[in-house]
Amino acid sequence: MSIVKSKIRTIPDYPKPGILFRDITSLLIDPEGFQLTIGMFVERYQNAKLNKIAAIDARGFIPGAALAFQLGVGFVPIRKKGKLPGNTISESYALEYGVDHVEIHTDAIVPGDKVLIMDDLIATGGTLEASIKLIQNLKGQIHECSTIINLPDLGGAKRIKDTYGIDVFSICEFEGH
């Protein structure tokens, strides 16, 4: 875990002053770090009998698709509103100054599918919470949520566990925001 954490770059004051942006692109361009990261997820979920990996737009797609490929399960993109063609359902989540939406195809989850939800990072948990609601609306069973990074000071993982009873597994944590 410390190897993965050491390969994640921190960019101060991005996207605005006071924010420490945890950038996974430095991890992704490092073959050892990226393979180790996906290997850790494979080890955790290889016996979970998952049907689908649902990953959140856009950085969640990278580990999500790699893990789905390794496990031989379906990959479901959860996208920002207006990016998916065809029939979709959407769910809103709060932003610092407003509201945004994510959506999923209505046929992406079959009732009873065992689903892992993935993103690159959990902060407040807003996008994961909206994704949980989407999967539950389609009658999927959420096995767990999984991220590369947890920012525990922002409380998202705890809120997901307390509100939905769903664990959030993260490979590494960073203090602050």
Curated annotation (Swiss-Prot):
**UniProt keyword annotations, A-Z:** Cytoplasm, Glycosyltransferase, Purine salvage, Transferase
| One annotated Gene Ontology cellular component of this protein | cytoplasm
Q: Where in the cell is it found?
A: Cytoplasm
Name the major location: cytoplasm
Catalysed reaction, written as an equation: AMP + diphosphate = 5-phospho-alpha-D-ribose 1-diphosphate + adenine
Q: One Pfam family, short name please?
A: Pribosyltran
A GO molecular function term, named singly, is: adenine phosphoribosyltransferase activity
Q: Which GO terms describe its biological process?
A: adenine salvage; AMP salvage; purine ribonucleoside salvage
From which domain of life does this come? Bacteria
Entry keyword Nucleotidyltransferase: no
Its pathway is: Purine metabolism; AMP biosynthesis via salvage pathway; AMP from adenine: step 1/1
- From the record, what ranges are coiled-coil? none
Against InterPro entries, the record matches this protein to:
Ade_phspho_trans (IPR005764), Adenine_PRTase (IPR050120), PRibTrfase_dom (IPR000836), PRTase-like (IPR029057)
Under CDD domains, the record lists: PRTases_typeI (cd06223)
Glycosyltransferase in keyword set: yes
The enzyme's E.C. designation: 2.4.2.7
Which family is it part of?
Belongs to the purine/pyrimidine phosphoribosyltransferase family.
**Self-association state and partner proteins as the record states:** Homodimer.
Q: List the PANTHER family.
A: ADENINE PHOSPHORIBOSYLTRANSFERASE, PHOSPHORIBOSYLTRANSFERASE DOMAIN-CONTAINING PROTEIN
Q: What does this protein do?
A: Catalyzes a salvage reaction resulting in the formation of AMP, that is energically less costly than de novo synthesis.
Q: What is this protein called?
A: Adenine phosphoribosyltransferase
Source organism of the structure: Leptospira biflexa serovar Patoc (strain Patoc 1 / Ames)
| Gene name linked to the record | apt
